[in-house]
Structures are given as structure tokens and as C-alpha cells.
Amino acid sequence: MKFDTVIMGGGLAGLLCGLQLQQHGLRCAIVTRGQSALHFSSGSLDLLSALPNGQPVTDITAGLDALRRQAPEHPYSRLGAQKVLTLAQQAQTLLNASGAQLYGDVQQAHQRVTPLGTLRSTWLSSPEVPVWPLSAQRICVVGVSGLLDFQAHLAAASLRQRDLNVETAEIDLPELDVLRDNPTEFRAVNIARLLDNEEKWQLLYDALSPIATNCDMIIMPACFGLANDTLWRWLNERLPCALTLLPTLPPSVLGIRLHNQLQRQFVRQGGIWMPGDEVKKVTCRRGTVSEIWTRNHADIPLRPRFAVLASGSFFSSGLVAEREGIREPILGLDVQQTATRAEWYQQHFFDPQPWQQFGVVTDDAFRPSLAGNTVENLYAIGSVLAGFDPIAEGCGGGVCAVSALQAAHHIAERAGEQQ
């Protein structure tokens, strides 16, 4: 099977790269094992929240300039501030075209409220998520009886520290009792599958309506809206106060929705989606990828003109830690890491951890190297890259988006030259 590009990994980076390549008229396939890290995320995307020295970033342009001085090997630093902002804006346009109407500005971060009621600087958020400063003084944090994925009293306690009048309440929906037989089934995603049924909308409205008459804003867990935000808009039009939603413990309704919107758009535009499959081997000839072998296709290889590695970091098994060191399991690419295991981590758990910055070594075009030699038609994007800390620096989603589009543009340019 021949393709212009085969992308190994179907997370945020892989999907955005595929969508951008389709804009250039290239035929793409994505090979993915299963759920991506988006399923376990908040659904919000960070661009740059803090510098390596811990300084918070509010002005993104100034932050990118400072980042280049502090971390010259960061994926952003390799591109330059203006290029990062341009690619981030293009990524936001792609996301919106896919149906993910996310709120945010590439020039200025905003503060979203977290499930614990604290604030986190971010780039893009779903319109349901409350953004600081809140537009209300009287707030009610509403939990769902029996839902362990969200603790209303913890969020309320944090918000009270910001001089807000915050109460808590709990709604009980007997229609959800079918899920209570097994506590592991009473999760936000399973609740959403029931509540998203239009026949159940009125039941949720009836439960929230008495609470809404006594406050200016309801904050509740995101336990509906798995496919779209239609129910949230329907409730907001009818309730006498604003309704906002907070992400829950994983799996996350907002994260799954974002992934599904991107995946459906990729397929709608003619992309080949290969779920439940896994790349087992990649054949390289004369420094280029010639064949990709997957588990499900056995002796039928995929033959791409270009290949993209978007396999993620440790969480997605894109990187594997062993006693001898860190390795990239598909091709055995060169990996940036510390010399000894003792340098992988810091003693204090909440300190920035060195292992977060491990990843494959690439050139400035994000082409990785194998035994010191660049693989000419292979690109590495997203969390598998080295040189950044997605947690401490708050840049995970941004690096995925920016590197994906940079690789896509580079591939499209080279593909045009080869025609």
C-alpha cells in the first residue's frame, strides 16, 4: 500500500500533522494502537506557561524570546518566536475547522479554573471551562451523587480563598442508577453516554434548575458532551445562571471529545485511519524509510514517500525506559538522555524532573537521527521530541501542535519538489 505520508501515532500531534498534510493535497494514513494521551487530558492545550527557571509566562512573545536564551535546544527555540506563533495560529484554525471551537489567543495566555479550584495558565480551552476572572460572585459547585471523579468541596475551598461566595450542592439522578452496580462504571465518560441522549436532557435541567435560582454561576464536572457541546448550550439558554464545566479525573470527556473531533475530520477528508494496529518494524534503505510493517497487515508493508513518528513519550510507549537507558522502540533512534540513571530524576517529587526532557535527537527540521545519521524522509513530532518539559513549562500541547505543522509544511514542500 502506497501513501504520500504514513504517520505512526494517532494523538494530537499525529492528527494535526495529518490534517495539515491533507490541506496540501497529500494522501495520508495514521497507524494507531488505541487511546491517545488526549483521552486522559483536560481538553485544554498549553502553549508556554513557565520558563525553565520557573518564571511564569503571560506575554507569549516575550516568553519565547526568554526561552531561547534559557533553553536553546527547546523545540520552540529551534523555530524562533515568530514561527512558533504563526504555526500555533494555524493549528488553532485547524482545530476550529474540525469542530473544536476552543477559546484562546496565541499572544496572551489565560487562566482556567482547574478541577481543584486553582488556576492554571493555558492557551486554548473549551468554551465550557470557567476562565479567570469569573463573571460571577455567587457560585455553586455542584457534584453528582456517587461520582468519585470530581470533589466539589475541594474546588469550592480553593475558590473561597479568592474572595468569592462559594457554596456546594449535589444532584442525584436516579436514571444513573444503572451504572451504580459497579463503582468502576460510574465514571464521567459513562455518565456522558447516558446524559447525551436527548431524552435525558430535561432530567438534568430539572435537577439543576432549583440550584440555579440561588446563584450566579454553576460549576459542575464535565460529565456530558462527549460528542459536542449541544447539551451545554441548551442548558445555558434555559437556566437563570451561567453553567460551566470542569474536567474530571481521567478518562476525560473534554479530552475524548477533542480527539474524536480531530479523528472524524481526518477521515472525512479522505485520510486512512488504522486503529488497533501497531508498527512492528520500519525498513530503512540508504538513509530513508522505505517500508513500514504493522501487526495487522503482516506481510503487506506500507510504502510511504515520507514517514512521521508521533508515538508519544513514556506514557504512550513512544519511549521505553530500561536498566541500560532510554530507547525509542520502533527504529532505535538516537535518544537524548543523561549519562547515568541517577541523573534521571530529582529527589523532590514536585521539582522539574530531568527525564521529562528525554526524547529523540533531531535536526532543526525535526528529522531524527539513527546511529548519528539523519533519516532523510522521517520526521519526529510531539511528545517524543527531546528538550522540553511539558509539565514544568506548560508547553505539551503547543509543542505537539507546532512541531506537527512544521513537519507537515516541510513534507509538503519536499513532496512538491519531487513531483
From Swiss-Prot:
This protein's UniProt keywords: Cell inner membrane, Cell membrane, Flavoprotein, FMN, Membrane, Oxidoreductase
A single BP term in Gene Ontology: glycerol catabolic process
Pathway: Polyol metabolism; glycerol degradation via glycerol kinase pathway; glycerone phosphate from sn-glycerol 3-phosphate (anaerobic route): step 1/1
Main localization category: membrane
Enzyme class of the recorded protein, top EC level: oxidoreductase
Topology of the protein relative to the lipid bilayer: Peripheral membrane protein
GO MF entries: glycerol-3-phosphate dehydrogenase (quinone) activity
Subcellular location: Cell inner membrane
Cellular-component GO terms for this entry: glycerol-3-phosphate dehydrogenase (FAD) complex; plasma membrane
EC assignment: 1.1.5.3
Reaction catalysis annotation: a quinone + sn-glycerol 3-phosphate = dihydroxyacetone phosphate + a quinol
Cofactor requirement: FMN
Family: Belongs to the anaerobic G-3-P dehydrogenase subunit B family.
Quaternary assembly: Composed of a catalytic GlpA/B dimer and of membrane bound GlpC.
Protein name: Anaerobic glycerol-3-phosphate dehydrogenase subunit B
Protein's organism: Salmonella typhi
Organism lineage string: Bacteria, Pseudomonadati, Pseudomonadota, Gammaproteobacteria, Enterobacterales
Protein's gene: glpB
